[in-house]
A protein has these predicted regions:
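Class I SAM-dependent methyltransferase Rossmann-like catalytic core
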Residues: 1-27
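Short alpha-helical
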Residues: 11, 39, 61, 138-139
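Class I SAM-dependent methyltransferase SAM/SAH-binding core
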Residues: 21, 25-95, 116
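Short conserved AdoMet
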Residues: 25, 112, 126
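Glycine- and small hydrophobic-enriched segments that form the cores of compact globular domains
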Residues: 93-95, 102, 106, 126-131
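A short SAM/SAH-binding and catalytic strip from SAM-dependent methyltransferases
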Residues: 99-115, 119, 135
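A short glycine-rich, Lys/Arg-flanked "PGG" loop and its adjoining helix->strand segment in the class I
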Residues: 115-130
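Conserved class I S-adenosyl-L-methionine
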Residues: 130-146
Length: 146
């Protein structure tokens, strides 16, 4: 058994990223709802190198872990490629119409009021913005073990 905290997040991020192959829209601003050890941002930055990111999560330790995984190289800071992080509940209002894409990798798993989260996400997306999220379903365990 591995002690990799982000193994399931990484697996789901990779699966969701593969689905982006059919999307023709190139987002310029991506909001990450729920830190996942930088797995999602890394994949999205490779696919959309010109996109700007902002990351939201209510857990400061998860934000710290994502920032640590990114590293803070001098070159990335000079190129203004840092990722602003915001420690807040996912149901709290996000900046209005601020994103072309909102991405959440298991961000809903710990939320008690998903309706409020979806309302916040809807407000943050621009018209015709893209919402991608992963979540556990009825058959998740069967799919992950096969």
């Amino acid at each position: 058994m591995t002690n990799d905290r982000w193994q399931i997040h990484r697996h789901l991020a990779e699966q969701a990223d593969q689905r982006l192959q059919i999307v023709k829209t190139v987002p310029r601003r991506i909001l990450l709802a729920g830190a996942d050890g930088d797995n999602s941002r890394r994949l999205l930055a490779a696919r959309y190198p010109k996109a700007a990111f902002a990351e939201y999560d209510p857990r400061p330790e998860c934000l710290r872990d994502a920032a640590d995984k990114r590293g803070g190289s001098l070159l990335s800071k000079l190129a203004a490629k840092t990722v602003p992080q915001h420690c807040q509940a996912l149901s709290a209002p996000l900046p209005e119409a601020s994103a072309d894409m909102l991405w959440s990798n298991l961000g809903l798993a710990t939320e008690h009021n998903p309706v409020a989260v979806f309302a916040s996400w809807a407000g943050a997306l621009q018209t015709d913005g893209l919402l991608f999220f992963t979540h556990f379903g009825r058959d998740t365990l069967l799919e992950l073990t096969s």
